[in-house]
């Protein structure tokens, strides 16, 4: 059989991955609604081998990068929708956050063309001001955390095009109306048994410095996400009355 030929030529590992890709392809062909959480879970279980899922995700990312070459608009939209609703959540679950963001942003580019270019233009026009703002916001936090004897990594970023577009739709506002364009990530470097305590210590330091919005507190330390993700999220009012997610 073909599987035996592959195994003989390339070994058991490659044969197993090819078999997984075939199983997933068969599942695709039988399922009309692939943009659901049920199908996502089914797809991962059918793959049986995480390498199969990684190959599929990489393949979809490559397809999205070449999508402008596809002339059939319906086919293009289907590929983009699957990237947004099927592959981006899988990438997120695997901790592949850059890939998740790229898949989502490219999906907006093809599904919401005008919105994508409007947001991109606005982001490009305000980049230097945003970078300066993030640096000013981070500096005093870094000083306070260092004074507290904490070991940490801190970095700031502007939300992705996809994230901003979702907020614009949810809040029914223009780009200027999105109130938390910025996100700061603080990663604590400490023994596992001290993680929760130090996370809450960082939370306390930040909310002493900046006014928090209690409605925006997300506690995934007490109840971690299903993929094992543990963190605290809070939105605070930074300089110039701008909201920042930490």
PLM regions: where:
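Acidic/His-rich, divalent-metal-binding segments that scaffold phosphate/diphosphate chemistry
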Residues: 1, 9, 58, 111
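Nucleic-acid processing machinery
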Residues: 26-42, 47-53, 60-245
